[in-house]
């Protein structure tokens, strides 16, 4: 069993109510909000909450996916299927200059690749469509720089984050006032934990990308990470042969930069049980979080989510 007690269900309902309140506040307060959809488990929960917030209607904002062109194939298939099911507009943005220049995580390194294909691409999209608020699925328990984030994260006209220039958030009162060109990144899942996310997915029967479930997959070991060979673009090193292992992913990103974990957890109760025994962060498998000192905070200051 998943071990979700009645008290635990009450806790999840409180988190749900808080998130729905935040989503409705943004829809009421901002002129042109958007929901960033990264296709991961947190995005799936956030989308589910948005649909609940405006049921039986459709959420009054579009979904947007910043596509680096290096996502897992199963992620893109899942994205297209979910967009069709929920009936929301899906905006896909690719940094065409970066793609034309052939920017990739192998020849250019994870730091430059992330800056060009994620950070700059996101800023391009926000400017192009004039969004004044963008929902994201980040949680405070994920990583140190995210632990000090506000629910409403103020960004200047260059989309930069200054942790010393943020607004107080008293109780459930949020200040969304922005000048022309400024914006707010909004994190409705700020107070959720990874365990909360999984238990809520189980209780609400929320569909997620199959990569979260353990299965035999071809992987190679690099820098202590199990990298899945998702397509022919992954260059194999001399003598490197993919090995089929039972693995799953705790977090999903670009496949050359996302490490799998060895696991046999193929159902939600098994994943939750595994979570209860795990003592490492889910983002320990994301190379972009460790490519330089203070990596995530530096990226956020430059405009990353």
Curated annotation (Swiss-Prot):
Residues 283-305 are annotated as: Disordered. Keywords: ATP-binding, Nucleotide-binding, Nucleotidyltransferase, Transferase. Gene3D superfamilies: HUPs. It catalyses: sulfate + ATP + H(+) = adenosine 5'-phosphosulfate + diphosphate. InterPro entries: PAPS_reduct_dom, Rossmann-like_a/b/a_fold, SO4_adenylTrfase_ssu, Sulfate_adenylyltrnsfr_sub2. CDD domains: Sulfate_adenylyltransferase_2. Pathway: Sulfur metabolism; hydrogen sulfide biosynthesis; sulfite from sulfate: step 1/3. It holds the Pfam family PAPS_reduct. Its EC number is 2.7.7.4. GO terms for molecular function: ATP binding; sulfate adenylyltransferase (ATP) activity. The keyword Kinase does not apply. One of its GO terms (biological process) is hydrogen sulfide biosynthetic process. PANTHER family: SULFATE ADENYLYLTRANSFERASE SUBUNIT 2 (PTHR43196:SF1). With CysN forms the ATP sulfurylase (ATPS) that catalyzes the adenylation of sulfate producing adenosine 5'-phosphosulfate (APS) and diphosphate, the first enzymatic step in sulfur assimilation pathway. APS synthesis involves the formation of a high-energy phosphoric-sulfuric acid anhydride bond driven by GTP hydrolysis by CysN coupled to ATP hydrolysis by CysD. Belongs to the PAPS reductase family. CysD subfamily. Heterodimer composed of CysD, the smaller subunit, and CysN. This is Sulfate adenylyltransferase subunit 2 1. It comes from Chromohalobacter salexigens (strain ATCC BAA-138 / DSM 3043 / CIP 106854 / NCIMB 13768 / 1H11).
């Amino acid at each position: 069993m998943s071990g979700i007690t009645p008290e635990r269900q009450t806790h999840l309902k409180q988190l749900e109510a808080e998130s729905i309140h935040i989503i409705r506040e943004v829809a009421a307060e901002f002129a042109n909000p958007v929901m960033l959809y990264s296709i991961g488990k947190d995005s799936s929960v956030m989308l589910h909450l948005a649909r609940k917030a405006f049921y039986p209607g459709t959420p009054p904002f579009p979904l947007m996916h910043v596509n680096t062109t290096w996502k897992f194939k199963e992620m893109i298939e899942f994205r297209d299927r979910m967009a069709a099911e929920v009936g929301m507009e899906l905006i896909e943005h690719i940094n065409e200059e970066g793609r034309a220049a052939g920017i990739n995580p192998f020849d250019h390194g994870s730091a430059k690749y992330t800056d060009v294909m994620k950070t700059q691409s996101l800023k391009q999209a926000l400017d192009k469509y004039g969004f004044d608020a963008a929902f994201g699925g980040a949680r405070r328990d994920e990583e140190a720089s995210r632990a000090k984030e506000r629910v409403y994260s103020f960004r200047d006209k260059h989309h930069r984050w200054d942790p010393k220039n943020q607004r107080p958030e008293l109780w459930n009162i949020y200040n969304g006032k922005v000048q022309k060109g400024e914006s707010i990144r909004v994190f409705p899942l700020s107070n959720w934990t990874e365990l909360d996310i999984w238990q809520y997915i189980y209780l609400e029967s929320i569909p997620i990308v199959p990569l979260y479930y353990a299965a035999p997959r071809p992987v190679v070991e690099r820098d202590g990470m199990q990298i899945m060979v998702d397509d022919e673009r992954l260059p194999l090193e001399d003598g490197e042969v993919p090995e089929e292992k039972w693995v799953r992913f705790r977090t999903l990103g670009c496949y050359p930069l996302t490490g799998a974990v060895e696991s046999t957890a193929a159902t939600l109760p098994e994943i939750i049980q595994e979570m209860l025994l795990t003592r490492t962060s889910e983002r320990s498998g994301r190379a972009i979080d460790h490519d330089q000192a203070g990596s995530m905070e530096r990226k956020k200051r430059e405009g990353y989510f």
